[in-house]
Amino acid sequence: MLEKFANIFRIPDLRKRVLFTLGLLAVYRFGAFIPTPGINSEALMQYFNANSQSALGLADLFTGGNLRKLTIFALGIMPYITASIIFQLLTVIYEPLAKLQKEGELGRRKITQWTRYVTILLAIVQSFAIGLTLTGSSANMVTIPRGAFIPMCIITLTAGTAFIMWLGEQITERGIGNGMSLLIFTGIVVGLPRGIMDLYGKARDSAWGAFTPIAIAILIVAMVAVVAFIVFVERSERRIPVQYAKRIVGRKMMGGQSTHLPLKVNSGGVMPVIFASSMLSAPLLFAGMSFFGSPKLQDTAFFGPILRAIQPGEPWYEILQITAIIFFAYFYISIVFRPDDIADNMRKYGGFIPGIRPGRRTSDFINDVLTRITLVGALYLCIITVIPTFLISGIHFNHLWLVGPVFDRLPTWMTNGLGVNFYFGGTSLLIVVGVAMDTVQQIESQLIMRHYDGFSPKSGRIRGRRSW
């Protein structure tokens, strides 16, 4: 295994890409130590510790702990993710954007440019909401006048978001892996030591009473089982057999071989979970916003019940999360995987699925198979996301309308969870394992392409023409 890792640095181009990626990730982490001016760090930390199981804890997970310290990268990559979701939805329902996307590289560049503009706009709105929330709080989290802090907060956080967006795009283009996913991955991994220390502190202080050993054992077993389950499903695929007919090209006989079309069970990877979590956590950032003396949104008669109902651990939040994950699983696969194009390419090169007519029938068959396995993949994402969250923060079944009193006798750990933070949740584990596997797979592809052995036992080196 050490020999295979050493191969990475023997290939100049791959070595350059890996070092470039690590360098930009280091720059991203350096920004976590630059606070926004005018912040009372101790008061802000106490506020976040008291609300670690709320939507703030989930939002802080995606920012790598930058939100709880309100650094220049406090918004993280969330505005960019939200903007990307908006434009991907628009390309489906708005015909001019759909045509622009089909124009090739020029059209995609135009959409990317608009996505950046919307990202900046969302960053301005979210930073304004954060400024209003902090200055309107009674916890004395701001040390300078409100009129000076809010513009400074908007400028600082928006500039930080623009820089993070640039970092992610540079990693994707010139580094290894998906830049945006790697930034989220880095933030979660860096926060794991703090999560472990919190877990140790709760166990030492007997915060869970007589059930401390059982609670820790359940958490460890659940995490190991979740990781193993993620690895198993992420490597699972449905293989559709494809046969290529023989044909004569010049003086050579081409085709005649049998192959397969691999369809991953979870073709969308971690993106449906990231999209769903981002969409659910973004509105909750406005919960504490107060417009110059008016009540906070979370205290108003209209928005208050809605915002409280979609907090993590609430039944409606889990229902919305499951619905959003299933929706984005199908939506994402409809964008990245087009059965019509695959069927046309197969027919063009003389390929066909045994028992299925080429053309429209092949496209329908691939679409049917993809629909079924995407449902399995979406349900897998829901299980991975919801069950660990149930163990960690619980689900408040007793808050359900009408049937709530039926659940009053449930054990406390089922309704309140074990009380640890989101770094041990299914969302974080799925992102960490999924992004790590995707990145390793890209490095492995680069190694095999250059005739080196990959990391997995089945990935032997590819022989060049000289060895035939």
Name what the model sees in each region.
Residues 1-101, 105-468:
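N-terminal cationic and glycine-rich segments that engage phosphates or anionic surfaces
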